[in-house]
Amino acid sequence: MEDKKQQQQQQREEAEAEEEAPVVPSSLRAAATCRSLSSLSSSLRWDHRGDDDEEEAELRWAAIERLPTLDRMRTSVLSSEAVDVRRLGAAQRRVLVERLVADIQRDNLRLLRKQRRRMERVGVRQPTVEVRWRNVRVEADCQVVSGKPLPTLLNTVLATARGLSRRPHARIPILNDVTGILKPSRLTLLLGPPGCGKTTLLLALAGKLDKNLKVTGEVEYNGANLNTFVPEKTSAYISQYDLHVPEMTVRETLDFSARFQGVGTRAEIMKEVIRREKEAGITPDPDIDTYMKAISVEGLERSMQTDYIMKIMGLDICADIIVGDIMRRGISGGEKKRLTTGEMIVGPSRALFMDEISTGLDSSTTFQIVSCLQQVAHISESTILVSLLQPAPETYDLFDDIILMAEGKIVYHGSKSCIMNFFESCGFKCPERKGAADFLQEVLSKKDQQQYWSRTEETYNFVTIDHFCEKFKASQVGQNLVEELANPFDKSEVYNNALSLNIYSLTKWDLLKACFAREILLMRRNAFIYITKVVQLGLLAVITGTVFLRTHMGVDRAHADYYMGSLFYALILLLVNGFPELAIAVSRLPVFYKQRDYYFYPAWAYAIPSFILKIPLSLVESITWTSISYYLIGYTPEASRFFCQLLILFLVHTGALSLFRCVASYCQTMVASSVGGTMSFLVILLFGGFIIPRLSMPNWLKWGFWISPLSYAEIGLTGNEFLAPRWLKTTTSGVTLGRRVLMDRGLDFSSYFYWISASALIGFILLLNVGYAIGLTIKKPTGTSRAIISRDKFSTFDRRGKDMSKDMDNRMPKLQVGNALAPNKTGTMVLPFSPLTISFQDVNYYVDTPVEMREQGYKERKLQLLHNITGAFQPGVLSALMGVTGAGKTTLLDVLAGRKTGGVIEGDIRVGGYPKIQQTFARISGYCEQTDVHSPQITVEESVAYSAWLRLPTEVDSKTRREFVDEVIQTIELDDIRDALVGLPGVSGLSTEQRKRLTIAVELVSNPSVIFMDEPTSGLDARAAAIVMRAVKNVADTGRTVVCTIHQPSIEIFEAFDELMLMKRGGELIYAGPLGLHSCNVIHYFETIPGVPKIKDNYNPSTWMLEVTCASMEAQLGVDFAQIYRESTMCKDKDALVKSLSKPALGTSDLHFPTRFPQKFREQLKACIWKQCLSYWRSPSYNLVRILFITISCIVFGVLFWQQGDINHINDQQGLFTILGCMYGTTLFTGINNCQSVIPFISIERSVVYRERFAGMYSPWAYSLAQVAMEIPYVLVQILLIMFIAYPMIGYAWTAAKFFWFMYTIACTLLYFLYFGMMIVSLTPNIQVASILASMFYTLQNLMSGFIVPAPQIPRWWIWLYYTSPLSWTLNVFFTTQFGDEHQKEISVFGETKSVAAFIKDYFGFRHDLLPLAAIILAMFPILFAILFGLSISKLNFQRR
């Protein structure tokens, strides 16, 4: 009992100690105090149970203490029951975490303190990490070009030539001799303008810099160089890019990460703690004991740490929702950002390097997360460096130290308390009501520096970054830093296990098990794709079986070729069926690279499950095919031969999947992989022995037959069939019929060769999967470390490193400066527009409840995201839409802007008093989306000009339009990067903040009456945010209606708004009215609510407002802020205003435009062609690669079929079949390559098209026609390559008629394959489904082309498929024009002599007199597919919003 009293006293002391928590706002302190007292009361109740319960608990503890150490680590007491912490259920984990961390801000601190106190009580310390770096300099290679620095086809070719010549490249500095130190238990803030080198510094410290960068200097952890331990496992780098598997839920993502990162030193520490506790006779707190033991167990599928991280990151509410992507609805952008952070801190890393973790988060959520990080740093003695763009003052105050960077140099590195004194010593002072972080970033800017000059008696001169650096080195803080670094690290002060020496946290077996578990999960989530493939294969089996129906197939020489053709077709079909594996494998590569480089798992652990788990799928698909087609076609009816065929087909399908996975691992992008996959397919097929028999190959190329997996498959299948008893009839030559058929094809091998073939296929499968694992191991993520800059730009670089990179130049546009948000009076162009009010009443929005939520017990079929939202946005009024992450801000904007593609919308939305008509509303509104979707291959200036061209009315002449574009570019400060390529997010091109500013410019240039902006300042630093908001304010001042959702506004930015709509989680309004001077209206409204804490002096009103209206404050006060608002006079006034605005003003009329689009169709088409022309010219990965493919293909075909097209060289049916096979192969492979290449290219552009279509920029037909037309010049290049390489090498007739007929036919063929690829993308929701349907198209084309099964032999019930097959008309025109008029040349066919023309007509059914009709029909296919592409673009939208 004495021990119990001591424990109670200790808990009281802990509760009192918690009141000393640093830097917690008064509002949060009030909420936390209440929660803390509640928790204390609860624990006291637990302590005052009856003696029986106490004795029972003591007996259980005594029993646990008698267990061996390992068992004791796994056993604890939870809710008075002994439990195995490895087998805690989901409910138990959730209840325990809720009990430990009921209120995040206070209870998290309490939990960390209890853990630390428990360890200190027995003399155990956490290992710590100190990071030092000295004179670190990072340089990148750059390619200097004349003109604009863009990756055009020409620049790429020249760069490749220079690369081959190994000429040295220029170098640009990124970091310039930076030095510093990060200590344990310190939370450090990294500040600086975008492009100053913050990310590079974080990567350098985390040991994750690209190997192509030139790095000098030293980085040490606890005095050890990076190459003496594994920095990736000792520290964690948290990227600013959110890369996750879209099919996985939040919980699954975190569990997977926790499992692979392991528990680090937790297990050893826990073992030591419980050993010493046993020796000292100490009984720990049951909940703390359970928690600490649970997070110390390695390799668990479901981790307690996951539940804890989800709780403190605010992800518990979306735990069972999939992450999603641009085409799939998932968690919000803010939740995705928190998941990126949680994914790494769920591990045991002692040093954290965090890159812009607050992008997309509201200020209260950012404060909460940074507060938790502060607690982790201070209590757990972690070393944490965090880069933030716009930290609010209260968030800034949480940090201990500051690193301020500019131009790749460290301007200040030291205590936060000294930084203002340092700048005051330099002559600069931060004004009142100005955030310190905003001041620190702006005082370094040439444009903004002067306003902070405090020495009025002295003349101001711009203080350069170098001058600041010199001042810092001379300051006391700078000298202290030098002294600290001069003292060697004392290695006796830390445990040896602070640094990780193991690359992976789990055993090889556990790594494999975890990867298997994830692969199974992803296969379940993608079950639709695999089911579709099986159904497709079954359907094709039925079609094939009924084409080669056994009742039409005799066992004789004439029908032997059909049996041979059906076997070959089965092989082709199963090979082509593997194509969708390309899209699946490539789509997963970015996440794989991230996790591989974090040392989650090795490449082999990822590759083996991908291979093994696809084996059952291959077996199912092979059984489906064989069981349906085998007896329908009428192969040898012996059971053993059925299973022998099944085995070969199974191995071929497994090999196909392995091949395409291997190709994906080396090619990495969808476009390159498509070309690589088609090239591999081409080589395998050409050397496979069917299109060109082994005996017909040139002698010096016959070795190629033995390196093609298809050869062994063909040997196995044909031997299995033609060596059967029913083919033993003897022919006139004395050999059996079966042998004769095999000899004609060069496949005459003994029956035992079947098993050699099967073994060879197994060998190929293993080889390809080893190659896949090697590719995954050695290839770096896509993107390049080599910048492309212009010669003019490069000449401006200071060799001493004053300028940083092509996008780091600190030169500013010529705009007037005063207050950062003061209206810009100079040069403001105001184009004519109509001011409009948008009002909405009782708006509700419902979506179908996600399956994951229903599985967790949510009963309702519909999930309501907006609840009776009523409000209005008026001209000239700048309105802010705010709320915590997940409150429904973006949802409301989407609903008002008409961007939702699903769900149910209720309520009345009016524009100017008239019901909103989306088609006309799109003309007068702009929408800056959160996701920043742009065409990747055009420049910043071109993006803005393109938007202006299509969205400004025809009355605006081109000169005015160009001036307006220039002004918008300068206003948003895009002038320095106007020639930069936009690129793909996270891969290439613009940074996050540059991309955000481009989004705003693209919408502003449309001169809208109403403009919606979804988080326009998200991802921007304080200065860039001020620039953007000044531009937005200027727009509103011209009389436009402007609405912005905003997350982390500074006081200055927040008070630039006129009105505020505040929402709480669940989609309910809690405030809708004016801000007032210095936000007085908002402050007064909430301070009048009983219990709401008063705002402190100089505190950010937006942050205070979000804090006092959070869910925990509602729970503490026992109020519903939404209900209070509904009952307020403000709500009644707003309702009255909305009703008055819902009636049209006298003398006004509804919106009406004489045309649907701002520009005429001709102008739309002109603009679209202009953009597509630029995009294509700058897409070498698409156009150069497919041109290279055509070139190589032409050479390969030319060599293999050298002069076999010469009619004089054709003497029998095999010679004719060989050259016809050449035509068939040329057509098929060039066509498939075009189709496969265009699918990912169009897929990337599709989300841009959806945005532009919503904006009403152009008719979908204008875009479609431009897209279709833009392919023609590049197809012409392909045609010329075929005509001047393959045509003469193969030996086709050099007559004008035959030459131009061949050119016409190949042109139509290449175009219809291309347009089919475009069409299939526009008809399907994602690239995987598009690939499946494309592969079905290829296989049907194969079957119905008239080559494998000639038209006269196709059953009449399938002949319609033959006539609707584009490839059949291609071969018709090819065969007819080349050989259909050869009446003089006679050859031996099947034992008789016929003219070539007669054989073509009799065997294939191709008639020369019907050639014009065939030519016309052939030309109709590209036209048909192009029209269907246009229809799909105009009618379908697979985005889920």
Swiss-Prot record:
ABC transmembrane type-2 domain residues: 510-722, 1163-1379
Keywords, alphabetical: ATP-binding, Membrane, Nucleotide-binding, Repeat, Transmembrane, Transmembrane helix, Transport
Any GO CC annotation of this UniProt entry: plasma membrane
Compositionally biased region (Basic and acidic residues): 1-14
InterPro entries according to UniProt: AAA+_ATPase, ABC2_TM, ABC_transporter-like_ATP-bd, ABCG_dom, ABCG_PDR_2, P-loop_NTPase, PDR_assoc
Compartments, as annotated in UniProt: Membrane
Positions of ATP 2 binding: 883-890
Entry membrane topology: Multi-pass membrane protein
Transmembrane segments: 528-548, 566-586, 600-620, 642-662, 672-692, 758-778, 1187-1207, 1215-1235, 1272-1292, 1300-1320, 1329-1349, 1357-1377, 1413-1433
Binding-site list for ATP 1: 192-199
Protein task: May be a general defense protein.
Family statement drawn from the similarity comment of this UniProt entry: Belongs to the ABC transporter superfamily. ABCG family. PDR (TC 3.A.1.205) subfamily.
Protein's name according to its UniProt entry: ABC transporter G family member 41
Species annotation: Oryza sativa subsp. japonica (Rice)
Gene name, Swiss-Prot/TrEMBL: ABCG41
